[in-house]
């Protein structure tokens, strides 16, 4: 017996040289007892989770050390304390009733051996399909090992993605096409080939939609039995902190490690949360080593994350990083049209183009804000019984648009555009910005408006505020130059020369 204890001590000593103190203590400090049965060492650990972890992550190394250090053939086996205990039906029923009180959705319960199968079958506590499963798989009056039994609860809230997010209702454009295609590819693949997927971009441009669409697609179309978990980073921090305080880390680990797809939104929120980052690092490595898919979103690329451990950011960078840019004007129009169809599926709601142009040009960098503005307008018109036109749109969205005007733009670039255009047409900046209606002033003014829109994608109403013109006048000026530049060679040449000077 002592010899076998010494053998295990030698193996432990070698493992401590290979793995960090943190990993070693977490996994191998939970050894309960060691016993010998002939040429076999049986090592008891506290939980089934720890046993499985050792087999998945460390057992090959243990066998390798065993072979190198000892000549005689020694078999090492791990068992968990809670799996060794046989429990009778009454105990199991009490356990089941306790779980029922605690949980509201679906969960998994691990049953011990049931000694009397007839008692099991005759008890109304179990459903018919469970009885049928026993009858089909086993004879009466034998021990039955039942694992991973599904009952009508879900302890860990797997499959918690919002069903409204799908690939079908995601509006694809140049700014998000690559991120969309990669996300769909990952959702459709049976094997993990891209891990992790790291999607970054400004707030409100579709990152959350995409990662939840991945989860929903997997749940609905491909692998419905897979466990999918969506969590925002702040929710992960709160949950980890609470479970740590309550000494329930085993539940926490069981929840997050027994999944097939982890979706983490806004990872940048973990900045400065050192303990949480350490826990997430361990979780990340566990899922990665076990070929479980990880998808992460952030408002910036991994190399720009502040106060996030470098060993985490390096793992993010080792995967596939894809960005989503702000949508261009036409893309924003398409998003608005899609949103209108969601609001009125019968397509009876007609909104004029100038109204959509106003919204699309006023909310440039945040799709969520733009959609919110549209919904405000639709509800405003519906509540008061108005037909939607440009006047009603301005009335309904006045405060929202005014707040957007406070956004700062690169004044140096705007000033340079005005100066270059004025010099090119040999007029003063003052005349360019004036309300003079002569052709020698209006044409250069229209050119300046067009270039500001093209180069900076600033909303029409804000461009109008620069020139003291309304939205409609600015829109017409832009469209006129854009249309004429396609057929007027001289105009096209002038625009190219002006652009060259601006960029020099």
UniProtKB/Swiss-Prot annotation:
List, alphabetically, the Gene3D superfamilies matched. 1.10.1750.10, 1.10.8.60, 3.30.300.180, P-loop containing nucleotide triphosphate hydrolases (3.40.50.300)
For the keyword Glycoprotein, the answer is no
Q: Region entry Domain II: which residue ranges?
A: 80-159
InterPro entries from the xrefs?
Answer: AAA+_ATPase, Chromosome_initiator_DnaA, Chromosome_initiator_DnaA-like, DnaA_C, DnaA_dom, DnaA_N_dom, DnaA_N_sf, P-loop_NTPase
What GO MF annotations does this protein's record show?
ATP binding; ATP hydrolysis activity; DNA replication origin binding; lipid binding
Stretches the record annotates as Domain III, AAA+ region: 160-381
Query: Can you tell me which residues bind ATP?
Result: 204, 206-208
Biological processes annotated in GO = DNA replication initiation; regulation of DNA replication
Organism domain of life: Bacteria
Query: According to the UniProt record, where is the region Domain IV, binds dsDNA?
Result: 382-504
Please state where this protein is localized.
Cytoplasm
* Keyword terms, alphabetized: ATP-binding, Cytoplasm, DNA replication, DNA-binding, Lipid-binding, Nucleotide-binding
Pfam families under this entry? Bac_DnaA, Bac_DnaA_C, DnaA_N
Q: State a GO cellular component annotated for this protein.
A: plasma membrane
UniProt keyword annotation of Membrane present: no
Residue segments, region Domain I, interacts with DnaA modulators: 1-80
Q: What is known of its domains?
A: Domain I is involved in oligomerization and binding regulators, domain II is flexibile and of varying length in different bacteria, domain III forms the AAA+ region, while domain IV binds dsDNA.
What biological function has been recorded for the protein in this entry?
A: Plays an essential role in the initiation and regulation of chromosomal replication. ATP-DnaA binds to the origin of replication (oriC) to initiate formation of the DNA replication initiation complex once per cell cycle. Binds the DnaA box (a 9 base pair repeat at the origin) and separates the double-stranded (ds)DNA. Forms a right-handed helical filament on oriC DNA; dsDNA binds to the exterior of the filament while single-stranded (ss)DNA is stabiized in the filament's interior.
Subunit text: Oligomerizes as a right-handed, spiral filament on DNA at oriC.
Designated name of the protein: Chromosomal replication initiator protein DnaA
